[in-house]
């Protein structure tokens, strides 16, 4: 079962179950799936035709340049649905670098197994493209979700752009399980705490730097939290 087929299954079985909450906006599994099907190509994104560099069934890369978390997610899923190889650009990437990224991809091509692309964080320089097959994620989701105790009843709070691999993997993994993702564009830890309490969040996924901010600003016990998952960086003794 593909990621899109899994979402269709939830739309058919539990269309009114909440899939995503962004601040006060709630999106059900039915609404999310319908948004994927009804979406049309957005000219803020860019299609790179791989031509003779890729003789596989997928030969077009979709560079997604949306800033909104919802738009990033829906366009990424739409790209999978339409047979593109979607890749979400980091919000801070400038036009010059996106142009260079597009040039490199068009010249070097992508592996024939690729279903989507991800970008490195760019901490050692400019972000670099990496390529993944859908099966490399979805075949591990059940194991991953079991390790992190993620299931259909999970309410997970996370913060960051969908362009970051850890965030996108966690979001799709939670949706695969039928759970609910809660996020915000706000950089204020007090806002994060408010959402965690309002929606009875039981999981948090965040970089240790953001966990430190959360700990620093949280003056009371968050009783609903059962699991905290740190992403990409080493947790220090203080945390």
Residue map of PLM features:
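Conserved pre-ATP/AMP-binding loop-to-beta segment of ANL
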Residues: 15-16, 105-119, 139, 149-156, ...
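ATP-dependent adenylate-forming carboxylate-activation enzymes
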Residues: 66-67, 85-101, 179-199, 208-210
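Conserved AMP-binding A3 loop
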Residues: 115-142
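Adenylate-forming
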Residues: 187, 201-239
């Amino acid at each position: 079962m593909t990621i899109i087929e899994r979402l269709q299954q939830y739309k058919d079985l539990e269309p009114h179950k909440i899939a995503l909450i962004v601040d006060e906006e709630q999106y059900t599994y039915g609404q999310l799936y319908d948004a994927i099907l009804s979406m049309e190509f957005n000219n803020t994104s860019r299609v790179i035709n791989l031509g003779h560099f890729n003789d596989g069934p997928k030969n077009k890369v979709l560079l997604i340049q949306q800033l909104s978390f919802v738009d990033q997610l829906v366009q990424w899923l739409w790209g999978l649905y339409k047979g593109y190889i979607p890749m979400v650009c980091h919000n801070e990437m400038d036009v010059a670098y996106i142009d260079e990224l597009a040039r490199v991809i068009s010249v070097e091509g992508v592996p024939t197994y690729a279903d989507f692309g991800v970008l490195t964080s760019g901490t050692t320089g400019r972000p670099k493209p990496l390529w993944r097959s859908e099966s490399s994620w979805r075949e591990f989701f059940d194991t991953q979700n079991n390790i992190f105790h993620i299931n259909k009843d999970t309410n997970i709070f996370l913060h960051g752009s969908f362009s970051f691999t850890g965030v996108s993997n966690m979001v799709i993994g939670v949706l695969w399980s039928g759970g609910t993702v809660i996020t915000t564009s706000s950089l204020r830890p007090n806002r994060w705490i408010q959402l965690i309490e309002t929606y009875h969040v039981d999981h948090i996924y965040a970089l240790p730097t953001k966990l430190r901010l959360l700990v620093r600003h949280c003056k009371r016990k968050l009783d609903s939290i059962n699991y905290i998952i740190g992403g990409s960086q080493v947790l220090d003794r203080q945390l």
